[in-house]
């Protein structure tokens, strides 16, 4: 971050950073209140494809997070924008709870494949239908390619391995719309009036959250909650600006050293 520029915006990952399923990270609500007590703009960015933005917002409010819908930017939003730009009819491999975010999108006689995290759809018959569409020239759109994510019972496969399987089988390359894509972070910052060099990203994924943000010029703070595993910070170059225990510790650092 350029020394002459003050911090103006903080982007915060949700799952694994503020909460894990229906449990908040300890101290996260109070830390968010402290961050909001400053002059920085706060936005929430997520690759979740398991639920619509409205369902996600309701989950966060039940956990007593003070968040409004217009502060959340999701990879589902980015995927819908791309579908509208391309004017294609997608085969939607997403969780049924995410379908409201695609309301109005024509899906009959599909000529594109959209993949999110949808364990109930990831079986041979459905994946083979997607495979055949791709062989016929349909574009493959990956909402994100996370390798795994954190559940209460442990780590679980993300959509990335399934996207990669279809890429391999069809000799094609998916268009990825979520983190760590540069366009995702730039779109999340749009409307804040902030440049990437004036922003910080806080997340539990060293590649998708921290690496992606730092690639566009932001500072990246990696938290050791959610999907974090020992030595994750050594997997990207440059390494995270900071690695700390949790979101409250990240906020402490911001308040003490970046404002």
UniProtKB/Swiss-Prot annotation:
Molecular functions per Gene Ontology: enzyme binding; metal ion binding; phosphatase activity
Keywords assigned: Coiled coil, Magnesium, Metal-binding
Disulfide bonds: none
Coiled coil stretches, renumbered: 47-71
UniProt cross-references to CDD domains, sorted A to Z: HAD_PPase
The record's free-text note on cofactor binding: Binds 1 Mg(2+) ion per subunit.
Matching InterPro entries: HAD-like_sf (IPR036412), HAD-SF_hydro_IIA (IPR006357), HAD_sf (IPR023214), LHPP/HDHD2 (IPR006355)
Cofactor field: Mg(2+)
Binding locations of Mg(2+): 13, 15, 204
TM regions (residue ranges): none
GO terms for cellular component: cytoplasm
SUPFAM superfamilies cross-referenced by the UniProt entry: HAD-like
One Pfam family per UniProt: Hydrolase_6
Residues where N6-succinyllysine is found: 50
Binding positions for substrate per the UniProt entry: 13-15, 46-47, 179
The keyword Thylakoid is annotated on this UniProt entry: no
PANTHER family to which the protein is assigned, alphabetical: 4-NITROPHENYLPHOSPHATASE-RELATED, HALOACID DEHALOGENASE-LIKE HYDROLASE DOMAIN-CONTAINING PROTEIN 2
Family of the protein in this entry: Belongs to the HAD-like hydrolase superfamily.
Protein name per Swiss-Prot or TrEMBL: Haloacid dehalogenase-like hydrolase domain-containing protein 2
């Amino acid at each position: 971050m350029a020394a002459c520029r003050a911090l103006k915006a903080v982007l915060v990952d949700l799952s694994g950073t503020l909460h894990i399923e229906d449990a908040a990270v300890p101290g996260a609500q109070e830390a968010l209140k402290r961050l909001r007590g400053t002059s920085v703009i706060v936005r929430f960015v997520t690759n979740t494809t398991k639920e619509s933005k409205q369902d996600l917002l309701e989950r966060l409010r039940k956990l007593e997070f003070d968040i409004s819908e217009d502060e959340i930017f999701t990879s589902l939003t980015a995927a819908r924008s791309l579908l509208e730009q391309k004017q294609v009819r997608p085969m939607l491999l997403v969780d049924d709870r995410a379908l409201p975010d695609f309301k109005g999108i024509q899906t009959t006689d599909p000529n594109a494949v959209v993949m999110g995290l949808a364990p109930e759809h990831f079986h041979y018959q459905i994946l083979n239908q997607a495979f055949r569409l791709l062989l016929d020239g349909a574009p493959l759109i990956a909402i994100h390619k996370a390798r795994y994510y954190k559940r209460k019972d442990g780590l679980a496969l993300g959509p990335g391995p399934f996207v990669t399987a279809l890429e391999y089988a069809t000799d094609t390359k998916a268009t990825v719309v979520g983190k760590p894509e540069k366009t995702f972070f730039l779109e999340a910052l749009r409307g804040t009036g902030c440049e990437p060099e004036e922003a910080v990203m806080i997340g539990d994924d060293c590649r998708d959250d921290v690496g992606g943000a730092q690639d566009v010029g932001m500072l990246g703070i990696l938290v050791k909650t959610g999907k974090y595993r020992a030595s994750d910070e050594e997997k990207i170059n440059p390494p995270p600006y900071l690695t700390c225990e949790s979101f409250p510790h990240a906020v402490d650092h911001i308040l003490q050293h970046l404002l």
